[in-house]
Regions:
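Hydrophobic transmembrane alpha-helices and their immediate loop junctions
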Residues: 1-151
Length: 151
């Protein structure tokens, strides 16, 4: 019961923050660029959440405050082995990149020119996570395999 209340509280925080931001700037809810960016950020965080749940880490329902912060509460991720930490760290950018690539293919097929450059920008923004800017990660090569670890 307590777990469901925590989930609802986190969801309520996310909804209230999105409503507050749309009240501050009315065009935020009608701007497809902002909505697409928020949706891709949500998919990014859900990638971390799903992978952490897969490895049975204590991941909590994500708090999502659009355009300011999004976080997944994972308290046991540091107890995992390096291989599993790497997978949890890479799951968010990989899932978001796959989603963006699918949107780009859809746009190129249906010739929606208005969002092509936005999707290219978002792809490059998500791919920046692989070079160590997300969560103080660094790369190291170990036995000819790339693994991402927390510093």
């Amino acid at each position: 019961m307590n777990f469901k209340i925590k989930k609802l509280n986190r969801l309520a925080i996310s909804i209230v923050s999105f409503a507050a931001m749309s009240a501050i700037n009315y065009t935020i809810i009608h701007n497809p660029i902002v909505l697409l960016s928020c949706f891709i950020l949500l998919i990014h965080e859900l990638g971390h959440y799903i992978m952490a749940k897969h490895y049975k880490a204590n991941a909590q329902f994500p708090i999502f405050i659009p355009l300011i912060i999004a976080s997944v509460g994972i308290t046991q991720v540091f107890d995992l082995e390096d291989q599993y930490k790497s997978n949890v760290a890479l799951a968010g950018p990989l899932l978001a990149s796959c989603f963006i690539i699918c949107l780009m293919l859809f746009n190129f097929l249906y010739k929606l020119f208005s969002t092509k450059f936005l999707l290219l920008f978002l792809t490059s923004e998500i791919l920046l996570n692989y070079i160590g800017l997300d969560g103080k990660k660094y790369r190291k090569f170990k036995q000819n395999n790339l693994s991402v670890s927390f510093s």
